Amino acid sequence: MEAIKKKMQAMKLEKDNAVDRAETAEQQSREAALRAEKAEEEVRSLQKKIQQIENELDQVQEQLSQANSKLEEKDKALQAAEAEVAAHNRRIQLLEEDLERSEERLKIATQKLEEASQAADESERMRKMLEHRSITDEERMDGLEGQLKEARTMAEDADRKYDEVARKLAMVEADLERAEERAETGETKIVELEEELRVVGNNLKSLEVSEEKALQKEETYEMQIRQMTNRLQEAEARAEFAERSVQKLQKEVDRLEDELVQEKEKYKAISDELDQTFSELTGY
């Protein structure tokens, strides 16, 4: 009987120890479950951050693509402006060459006019000299009359030549007026072209400034992309670490649950043994 009591006390003590171990295992299991939930929550938070970073990265890449498109458009506009400037330069060169030819024709016409005027003055001088000379000798008179006729003929020829020269001079003056009008038109066009060149130059400067800003923005975007990539890599590393931690905690939870099941089985076995012992004692 004393042995049975000792055995019952030992079994009760073992039962109490098993209950304590079971409670401890349950507490550890709950704590492990809380740690696992916390780790899972951190993983979800990291996944959200990763998704947010990926969205920001997509936005930055889209902005970079738009900036590159705008930069290409500005390059095309710059090339078109340069082509327009080259066309204006060619037009100015043609106008300058036309003006030089007109000035050369005017110079030649002026020289011819001076030569014709000198010839007409010389003929008129000879005619007046022959008309006013007093000659008493008949032969000399006849000779002089012949010379006079010849001089008149020469004068008439000179008049005809003068008329021809005058007609040509009028044509030259008309050509000169047209050349001057063309020169004035050319000067006006040159002024307009210079103004256009100034506007184009300002546009080129603006494009250069815009290009510099675009390059600066591109560098900023690239730096942001590098930063986002680093942040994404760090977040992925943290996520991998958190996943490994969750796996470890899950293994710990599984182990504690297995121990809990074992302790419950031991507790059940002890309870069954106690019940059997009580039944035996009662029957005894």
UniProtKB/Swiss-Prot annotation:
Q: Which residues form a coiled coil?
A: 1-284
This protein's UniProt keywords? Coiled coil, Repeat
Compositionally biased tracts (Basic and acidic residues): 12-38
The record's annotation in InterPro entries points to: Tropomyosin (IPR000533)
Signal peptide (residue range): none
Region entry Disordered, spans: 1-38
Spell out the subunit comment. Answer: Homodimer.
Its job:
Tropomyosin, in association with the troponin complex, plays a central role in the calcium dependent regulation of muscle contraction.
What family does this belong to? Belongs to the tropomyosin family.
- Comment field on protein domains: The molecule is in a coiled coil structure that is formed by 2 polypeptide chains. The sequence exhibits a prominent seven-residues periodicity.
Protein name, as recorded: Tropomyosin
| Species per Swiss-Prot/TrEMBL record | Rhipicephalus microplus (Cattle tick)
Biological classification of the source? Eukaryota, Metazoa, Ecdysozoa, Arthropoda, Chelicerata
